[in-house]
């Protein structure tokens, strides 16, 4: 009888906890060691871990908040996870080394590399990758499109060598991707996959990585990782401004109002905040080591960075930069998004 009572109480507690979590804003963090962790955003208490396989990378959440899409490098798959049950409902074969994921209108756009040319670091590595790119057997990366409602691939778009960041035009008709080894940003028609334009970035700096559209749709910010630069493109996809940043810029986003630009500095262990009009540096938010990706909370009061080398999550006050929480997170945290969706290096606010 006591055992049965304990079981009932435990079950009730779990149901209450699940219902509570479902009604509260949450953060999803991908870990390279093979799992996704879910946290309550108000206090960053962990709710659950979901095993997905080694190399969990980019993520995106459906518009209704019921499905989480996760790129898993080791399996070459996009996994669809039912958030309420925390069960994997679908495995979709994508290709080698799937990494970046963006969701638009319940379609997941997933970058992968058929040639499996892995990312490297440093100028020598960049030169070697260019040589590999020029080889006859080099294959451009691609962006596959998956319908989150049906779980089926509906398109496959050829990009460039080592595609990294993904963004969309304000009208939802164009796809912009940063091609690291090609040293360009390519723009494609989403409906047809046709290449519209290429923006050469190497004259301004090396290794384009992150890309994010301003909320008004008039500009795009692109990080040039090996040159400590931030490139600003106008809505016609022309270079408008070049801004110097701190050491090794990676993930980037605008705030929801479009008044500030946030840039993750992988080696400087900080997030640099710029005025979106004057491009003056407004403040520096200290984080951890190799924090490639970050998000703002839905109300934008907090910034949360996933720091892969220091194995922690850093929660900071967005305005003051004060560290509110430093959460040990072994397993090499890679990316972070929230639901309700908020602006960050991997997502945008609906």
State what each model feature region is.
Residues 7-16:
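Bacterial N-terminal signal peptides
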Residues 1-7:
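Positively charged n-region of N-terminal signal peptides that target proteins for export
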Residues 17-350:
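Predominantly soluble domains enriched in secretory-pathway, periplasmic, or organellar proteins
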């Amino acid at each position: 009888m006591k055992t049965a009572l304990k079981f009932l109480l435990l079950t009730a507690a779990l149901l209450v906890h699940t219902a509570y979590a479902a009604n509260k804003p949450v953060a999803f963090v991908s870990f390279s060691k093979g799992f996704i962790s879910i946290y309550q955003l108000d206090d960053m208490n962990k709710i659950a871990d979901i095993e997905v396989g080694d190399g969990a990378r980019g993520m995106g959440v459906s518009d209704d908040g019921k499905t989480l899409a996760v790129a898993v490098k080791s399996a070459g798959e996009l996994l669809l996870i039912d958030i309420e049950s925390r069960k994997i409902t679908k495995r979709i074969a994508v290709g080698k080394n799937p990494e970046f994921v963006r969701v638009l209108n319940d379609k997941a756009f997933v970058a992968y590399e058929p040639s499996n040319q892995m990312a490297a670091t440093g100028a020598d590595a960049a030169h070697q990758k260019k040589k590999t790119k020029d080889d006859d057997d080099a294959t451009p990366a691609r962006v596959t499109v998956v319908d989150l409602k049906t779980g089926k691939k509906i398109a496959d778009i050829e990009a460039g060598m080592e595609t990294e960041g993904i963004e969309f035009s304000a009208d939802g008709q164009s796809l912009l991707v940063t091609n690291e080894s090609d040293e360009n940003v390519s723009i494609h028609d989403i409906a047809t996959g046709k290449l519209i334009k290429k923006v050469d970035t190497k004259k301004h700096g090396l290794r384009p990585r992150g890309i994010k559209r301003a909320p008004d749709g008039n500009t795009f910010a692109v990080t040039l990782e090996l040159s400590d630069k931030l490139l600003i493109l106008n809505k016609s996809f022309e270079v408008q401004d070049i801004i110097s940043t701190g050491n090794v810029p990676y993930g980037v986003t605008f705030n929801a109002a479009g008044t500030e630009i946030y840039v993750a500095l992988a080696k400087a262990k900080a997030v640099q905040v710029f005025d979106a009009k004057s491009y003056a540096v407004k403040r520096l938010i200290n984080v951890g080591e190799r924090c490639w990706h970050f998000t703002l909370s839905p109300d934008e009061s907090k910034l949360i960075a996933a720091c892969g080398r220091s194995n922690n999550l850093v929660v900071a006050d967005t305005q003051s930069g004060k560290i509110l929480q430093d959460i040990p997170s072994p397993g090499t945290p890679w990316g972070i998004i929230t639901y309700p969706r908020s602006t960050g290096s991997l997502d945008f606010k609906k």
